[in-house]
Amino acid sequence: MNEMKFDMHCHTKEGSMDGKVPIVQFAGILKRKGYDGMLVSDHNSYKGYRAWEKHHRMLERAGESDDFVVLKGIEYDTIDAGHILVIMPTGSKLKILELRGLPVQLLIEIVHENGGILGPAHPCGEKYLSITNTAKYRNCLSVMDKFDFVEGFNACEDMDSNRRAKELAKHFRKPAFGGSDAHKADCIGLAYTAFDGAVRNESDLIACVRRGGVLDCGGVHYEGTTKDRLGKVNKLLVESFRFYNRLGSMWRHHSRKRELHRQFKS
């Protein structure tokens, strides 16, 4: 069995406003820790992955290579179901995924129509950010049947949140991913997902998930989260994020509408 170890939730300095570690440095830390690859999952942006592509092209021109696998993903901010991790087939380009604010049912439809997979990040975490703590889906979790996986372990979530996330994955018979959700260097590599077989690109990953090739996930809790540092004050930050997300969704309304028209017209 060819087992590969990935960190499946990674934020970079280039792609996430709150990311502190450039992607080349991020990948280097994971490689030194014995990881085979990572999923770039910046907030509503592929800028981090594009920075990696640029680095990779420079290596090729210099006649060098790197066997560490960097997969293109995104953490999408829905308007009604919190954060959703999305992976599209290799070479796929959907501008709509960089425009926050779609309702989750429409996001699921778009991703599946284009051959991708998706699942809720930290599903039992913070209010508004996590699907089981949203007003619309708190008591209506049948939508879980439509996902392809669940993030079962997130290093930035507490033990109870991760326990419930794994129970959710088990109840709906979904494979569970593990990811550090790292924004800072000291959080990188605190979670993992083990895959059965060679995963060299996004299409490999999608095929692996669909054939039941997710073996295990787990990790350790990161003690330096904003929630840990701020305590009760963190609730104010969560409320401000809700406002920011809705404002961002309104700001991108016309761009989303234009991209949706293009998507369904084609």
Where are the model-predicted features located?
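Short, well-ordered coil/turn segments that N-cap beta-strands
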Residues: N2-M4, G34-G37, E64-V70, N114-G116, ...
